[in-house]
Amino acid sequence: MRLPTFIETFLSRTQVIRESKEYASSIYKIIGRNGIIGFSYTFANKGNGSECSPSLPTLYEVVADAHTHGASSVNSEKKYYDNEFSGLRNENGKFISKEERKKENGNNDIGNANRIKKVSYLVTPNGSLQKYNPQNGEITIVSNDMPSDPNDPTRVNENTINYIEPIENDINKYTIY
């Protein structure tokens, strides 16, 4: 499985929009006895509506991190730039250049990726999967096919999340939303 498809599989299974929480995980490399390289991910840490730190593997090399932004903040008191990596704008709200991105070291998505020198993937409320490469400062859209928040005014698809929740006291019955 190529890495972006792997990320899509992992991140499409989280309940970020319904819960309006961020989730974060580390992507790590596995080399089999026959030399074949594969990837896996750590159990996703659940954060709050605006931040989360990825869980880390014990014995494997981290090659990237992946996280989600919560639900769209369009109807919230506190507004965020939901559909982009944090750290992509300066204090005046203007986008920073690729060269400035590579130097960013604040406590934000771009700064964190730069400090650990690892690629970072982000799933946004509008349904896009983005990749930030700290080596060259580039942000690319990997996919526009992720689950999206119907409230997001910049929604790029009609993919909604079906959430299955166990009915209290009966593990054999589920409610589907």
Regions found by a protein language model. Name each.
Residues 22, 26-32:
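Short, contiguous, well-structured surface segments enriched in hydrophobic/aromatic residues
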Residues 19-21, 115:
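A generic fold-level signal
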Residues 51-177:
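Active-site-proximal loop/helix of nucleotide/amide-processing enzymes and allied scaffolds
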Residues 33-60:
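Betabetaalpha-Me/HNH-type nuclease active-site subdomain
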